[in-house]
Regions:
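A short, charged helix-loop
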Residues: 98-120
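Mixed-charge, glycine-rich, non-catalytic linkers/tails in nucleic-acid processing enzymes
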Residues: 74, 114-148
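Short alpha-helical "patches" and their helix-cap loops
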Residues: 38, 100, 145-148
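Charged catalytic and DNA/RNA-contacting regions of genome-maintenance
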Residues: 66, 77-101, 108, 133, ...
């Protein structure tokens, strides 16, 4: 089963979100992330037999995807946010921006969320996937050290 790191960019927090701009993802068969824009394609993607891995996906991504696209939470998922808090308790900051600094993958700065181009949303989303891919590799390594 493919371990698949993903992220989505939307138009707001859970109380106002009504649009998904892009879903980007990477699995172990890919060198670079790919992106999906079409709502039907996004729905089909989350029906695939994969392990879906993301940062804060339980608290935001899947609730937002459910609200906008009626996407059900997959059976197999890993949220790297609480996992990082548990396995890296002394870190202090658990946002992808800080991890991006650690891994040499800068998180793009956004000043105007409402007027980005599709390319801007995609670049940000794919950058988050690259950062989270590195984080997932670290977390998986720590889990293997603990549990073999």
């Amino acid at each position: 089963m493919l371990e698949t790191v993903f992220d989505c960019e939307t138009n707001g927090l859970l109380d106002v979100v009504d649009r998904v701009h892009v879903v980007s993802y990477k699995d172990e068969t890919m060198r670079e992330p790919e992106s999906i824009y079409d709502y039907e394609d996004i729905k089909e993607f989350f029906k695939q037999d994969r392990i879906f891995i993301g940062h804060h996906i339980i608290g935001y991504d899947f609730p937002a995807l459910a609200k906008v696209l009626q996407v059900s939470k997959p059976k197999r998922l890993v949220d790297t946010y609480p996992l990082a808090v548990t396995l890296m308790p002394k870190r202090g900051s658990y946002g992808l921006e800080g991890f991006g600094v650690d891994y040499g993958v800068p998180k793009p700065v956004v000043k105007d969320w409402e007027n980005l181009t599709r390319e801007d949303y995609t670049f940000r989303c794919e950058s988050d996937v690259k950062i989270n891919w590195c984080l997932w590799e670290d977390l998986r390594r720590k889990l293997m050290e603990l549990y073999g």
